[in-house]
Amino acid sequence: MTIKVGVLGAKGRVGQAIVEGVNAAEDLELVASIDRGTPLEKLVESGAEVAVDFTQPASVMDNLEFCIAHGIHAVVGTTGFDSERLAKVEGWTQKEDAGNVLIAPNFAISAVLTMVFAAQAAKFFDSAEVVEYHHPNKLDAPSGTAVHTAQGIANARQEAGLDAMPDKTEQSLDGARGADVDGVHVHAVRMQGMVAHEEVIFGTQGQSLTIRQDSYDRSSFTPGVLLGVREIASHPGLTVGLEKYLGL
């Protein structure tokens, strides 16, 4: 059975890769390409069952409210979701005949595994820091992936009953130690030539562990997005993180 898909942000760099992936899949049909100036009603008129959103933080909430209210499932790679926004989306999904929502900080399978592996490793090391690298046109810093990774590390450390990480450093310049995400330092690099990359560095007495993930092309997000499109109907309400669709 073919799943009818609409792509929001279809002319963006990631959106173009998603459109190409949907068109190449025998079990998916692209029925709507939505960009600035295109009314969201096109999703309803085309019979879209799932909408993929790679737009902007400023517009994603309106997009989600529309999709959920019209019973259209939404696979979302747009960033900018804090706890308040997530709570609002979850509330929308609880209404009768609402669409389901998958929000993932990263759809690259390698990035998802990096987050999972980092959380597993966290309890074995005294120190952990996250470094993310992106192209200079990325709008936010640190990335949602880096924040999600740091939160996973912090949660794992808390569950293991670990003390705060050792750090007696006094900053001579503000920001020298990066951002603090629940006690985990996160550093954002913006550099020409980069796409999306992350390093998680762990240290303890006499040893260290580095977990690194690299997305060299935006097509790296396509397999994860298509997995979400295929599976979202069987995951009611709001799901945050692709790892839950992977059984991790």
From Swiss-Prot:
Q: Which GO terms describe its cellular component?
A: cytosol
GO terms (molecular function) for this protein are:
4-hydroxy-tetrahydrodipicolinate reductase; NAD binding; NADP binding; oxidoreductase activity, acting on CH or CH2 groups, NAD or NADP as acceptor
The record's Gene Ontology biological-process terms are:
diaminopimelate biosynthetic process; lysine biosynthetic process via diaminopimelate
Residues binding NAD(+) are 9-14, 77-79, 104-107
- Cited PROSITE patterns: DAPB (PS01298)
InterPro entries associated with the record: DapB_C (IPR022663), DapB_N (IPR000846), DapB_N_CS (IPR022664), DHDPR_bac (IPR023940), NAD(P)-bd_dom_sf (IPR036291)
Q: Which residues bind (S)-2,3,4,5-tetrahydrodipicolinate?
A: 135, 144-145
Disulfides per UniProt? none
Give the UniProt subcellular location, in the record's own words. Cytoplasm
* Top EC class, one word: oxidoreductase
Keyword set, alphabetical order: Amino-acid biosynthesis, Cytoplasm, Diaminopimelate biosynthesis, Lysine biosynthesis, NAD, NADP, Oxidoreductase
The name this protein goes by in its record: 4-hydroxy-tetrahydrodipicolinate reductase
Q: Give the organism the record lists.
A: Corynebacterium aurimucosum (strain ATCC 700975 / DSM 44827 / CIP 107346 / CN-1)
User: What gene makes this protein?
Assistant: dapB
